[in-house]
Amino acid sequence: MLNIKDNERFAVFIDGSNFHSTFKSLGFDVDFALMLEELKKTGRLVRAYYYTALPHDGDFAPIRRLADWLDYNGYTVISKQTRDFYDSATGSKRTKGNMDMELALDMLKLAPHIDHAVLFSGDGDFVRLIEEMQNRGLRMTVVSSTKTKPPIMADVLRRQTDDFVELDDLRDLIGRPQRDDDGDDDYIDDGYDDDDGAVMLDDRRRT
């Protein structure tokens, strides 16, 4: 799945909103249990982080259900409440919940204990983080996609990272089978879809 050496200690950092936007744009859903199994097949996985913002009044929101499931099934979920603000330009209420700072701090904090960091995001704002990790002697892999329209993978991020993995190439490994029309009780809604009453919690920067 990834170019991880057998003796490498590595950690995974998933930008939840950006990752969701990527696999949805590619037309498939991710089986997070299967993905964790695949990640454990190579190297020495130290930790798999998942970052997401949660609506402050969303105890029963789909994204909360996903976060709880991940937390109980091998992932370390880092979350914070969204913040509502008034957009004077449009005259409407908007919701913000950016997790970039939390992800960056955790990656830097874990750097002395790993050899390789894997970032699931195409956000160009992470380019300086990747550069700093490389300066500390770590290898960096970014998982995103250039096949979405427009590409979610920022060009500056692809040029900076040591390895780039095209998410579309992983769909047969970590993709969830198509749901039947009558639903699937085992399906965990990712909670980011607007038609579920949730909001898109993060912007998707492409540079």
Regions found by a protein language model. Name each.
Residues 1-207:
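Terminal and domain-boundary accessory regions
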